Amino acid sequence: MLTRDGAGRILRARWPPLVALTATLAYAVVVIGFGLDFRPLHNDEGVTLGVASRASAIDVLRVAVEHRHGPPLHYLLVHASLAWRYDILGLRLPSAVLGIVAVAVSYGFGRELVGRGGGAIVAVVTASSPITIHLGQFARGYTAMIAAAYASAWLMLVLIRTGKARWVGPYAVTALLLVSAHPFGLFALFSELVLMAIFAAVRLRHGLRGQRRLAAAVVAALVLGGLALLLLRHLYSPLQGKYGVGSGTSVIKLGSARFWERFGDAASGSTHAGFGVALAVATVLGVAALAVRNRRAAIFAAVWLVLPLVLLSVLTASSRDFAPERHLSFLLPGYAVAMAGFALELRARAGARFGGLVAAAAVAVLLAPGWVADHNELSDFNADLRDASLYMADRFGPDDVLATTSGTLSQAEDPRLVGAYAVLAAPSSSPLASWQHAGPVRGCKLVRRIGQRRAPVGTVWLVMSVPDPRPVAQSLRTAGADVRGFGTFLVASAIPRQPTVISALLTAHYLFHTAVEADPSAYDVRRMVRLYRHAAAVDASGECSR
C-alpha cells in the first residue's frame, strides 16, 4: 500500500520527468483545445495551403523546391495532414503537434546538458514561452524548426559524450530535418556544427590515443551535417534575390533599441521593457553561473545565442520582412538552458531546504508575463468566422459562387483568405468544399475564378468583416440581399439578374458598393468595388475569352 511518505519519496525522485510530462500535456491542451480551429488564416498560411494542397507529395515537393524555394519538410507534413482531413485542423495540426514534440524533446535535451532538474526547467520554459504558444497555432514551419533544433542538439551531445558511431545516422537525419523545416534553420545548424567541433576538440585535446572511434564519429557527423547545410543552402539560394540579400542594411542591428525591444517583447510576452530586461539579465547570469558549474552547458548556451546574432548582424538584406519573434525562434534551446542555469544556481545558493522553492518562485516570476500573454492570446478568439462559414456551407448550392472575401481583420490576418477558411471549414458534402476561392486574383483571373463551375450561375455569396456591421447589414437587406451577421462578419447572398458570370460580377459589385455607402470607413471593401467593376468591364470587352 502506498503511504504518504512513499508517495513523497516517489515525487521527490521522479519530479523532473513528471514536471516535463505536465508541461507537455498542458501545452498540447492549450494549443489544440483553444482556438486552433477558429482563427482566420494568416498571410503566410495562404502560401502553405497553396503548396501543400497539391495533388501528390511529389507535386508538393516539386513546387516547394522549384518554385517557392521554401522548406520542403513543412509543406510535406501539411500535405499529409490535409490528405487525412482537408479542413482547418488538418492545415494547422502539424504545427501544433511539432510544438508538442518540441516540448517533449526539450526535456531529454536539457537532461543531457544540465541534469534532470535542469531538463524539467527547460521543458517548462519551452512550453510556456509566448513564442512557442503562438507559433504552434499557425501553419508555418517554425515549430518544426524548434523541435528539430532540440532533437539534433540532443543527439549531437549524446554523440560527443558516448563517441559511438550509431548516433551519426540519427544525428544526420535530424540535422537535415532542421534545415528542411525553415531557412533560418541554417543558422541553427551552423551553430550546432561549431559546437560539435568545440566539444570534440575538448574531448580530443590530449590526442587520439584510445579515442579514434570518437574522432571518426565526429568527422562523419560533421561531414553529413555540413552536406545538409550546403544542400539546403543551395535550395534556398534563390530567396536571396527575393529578400535582397547582400544589399541594404544589416538584418539585425545589435545596437538598435528597436530590435531588442521587439525581441524582448516576444520573449517576455509583455510590452513593458522591464520584463524583457529581467529575462535578459537572468539569461546572462544563468550563462555566467553555468560557466562555473557546467562549462559544457555554458559554452552551448553562449554559442547558440550569440553566434547567430553576430552572423545576422553581418548579413545584409534590403527586405523588411525580418521578424525576430518568428525567425529567431530557433534560439529557444540556448535561452532555455541559460534560464535553467539561473534557476539551478539559485537553488544551490538557497540551500537544500528552501532552494527548490526559491528557484521555482524565481522562474515563476520571470515567466509570469509570458503566462499572462499566453492566456490573453488563447482567450482572444471566437467562433464567429467558423459559424459564418458553416452557415454559408449549409446553404451553398452547386451553381453558387463565392466572391472575393474582404474586410478588416487583426494584424497579419488576410481578409482574402477568409474564403479559403470557409472552404476548409465546409463539410465535404457541401458544394462549397470544392469551390476554389478567389483569393487575391483580379482581372481575367477573377472572371475565370467566378465562372469556374462552367454552368449557369446561381446565388452570389459575399463574406465581409466590418467594424460596425449593423448599418451595413441593413443597407444590404434594403438592396435585396439576404444577410446574416456573426459578430463583425456578415454573410450576404443575392441572385443575379441573369445566370451569367458578368451578371454575377455586377451583382457582387453592387453589394460591395452598397456596403461602402453604409460604412465609408470599410476601405478594404472599397477596393472590392473597383476590383469587380474592372473585372466586369474586361469580361464585357471579350478580353478574357481570347
Predicted regions and their residues:
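Intrinsically disordered, low-complexity regulatory regions of eukaryotic regulatory proteins
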Residues: 3, 42-43, 537
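Short, Lys/Arg-rich, polar N-terminal cytosolic tail immediately upstream
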Residues: 1-13
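Short, low-complexity, Pro/Ser/Thr/Gly-rich segments in the mature regions of secreted, periplasmic
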Residues: 529-545
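Membrane-proximal helix-loop-helix interfaces that form the catalytic/acceptor-binding platform
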Residues: 13-527, 544
